[in-house]
Amino acid sequence: FEMGFIDDFTDVMNMETGALKYIMSLLQREYAGELDLLHAQVPEITEIPCIKFMDAKTDVIMKKFKYKPTDMKDFDPQEEEILGKWAKKELNSDFLFVTHYPSKKRPFYTMDDPADPEYTLSFDLLFRGLEITSGGQRIHDYDMQVAKMKEKGLDPAEFETYLMTFKYGAPPHGGLGIGLERLTMHLLGFKNVREAAMFPRDINRVNP
């Protein structure tokens, strides 16, 4: 979803936290029997803790778990698993927000952190060590967006319609994309995301 007139990207994180609280509460209230059949453990959510990307990379993954990353700008699946274990053990949470991802790894529309432009006002949400969401604050200033496109090697002329919005005024806004099938897969303990989709799609299956 996308939402306008935000104060900062934490508004988006708070909205997702509220949505997940509602979803998990509804599942426990309305579908307890079905969840028992599948031996699903529905997490209790009060608040979702968060940690900055570089703190997670250096303090948790490298120092605490002695894991040597191959990429300092992103996480590999094993690093996400490490963070999931750490969040459960140290913070008693199945969920963990990781914020301030490097600008080089985020799309052209992601707002850089004014305090440190090498990083962004963005986040991923991990659920039991699996990324289920990416989101953040979007750029809403025309000149800033054009500059970011050029920095990413894109031609602003090819995005004329997109940029018109910012020319005539756009509010501070943000949004996220959530993998509901990933969430369902991990919640129910499935091994493959196709098991959590009614009509799975891949390069060999496009119909129905």
State what each model feature region is:
Residues 1, 56-58, 98, 135, ...:
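A residue-level signal for conserved active-site and pocket-lining positions in enzyme catalytic cores
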Residues 2-11, 129-132:
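A generic structural motif
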Residues 3, 100-101, 129, 180:
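Residues immediately flanking
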Residues 13-20, 142, 181:
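Hydrophobic face of alpha-helices
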Residues 13-17, 110-111, 137-138, 197-199:
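Composition- and surface-driven signal marking solvent-exposed, interaction-prone regions
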Residues 18-128, 151-164, 168-169:
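Metal-assisted phosphate- and nucleotidyl-transfer catalytic regions
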Residues 136-208:
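Active-site pocket scaffolds in enzymes
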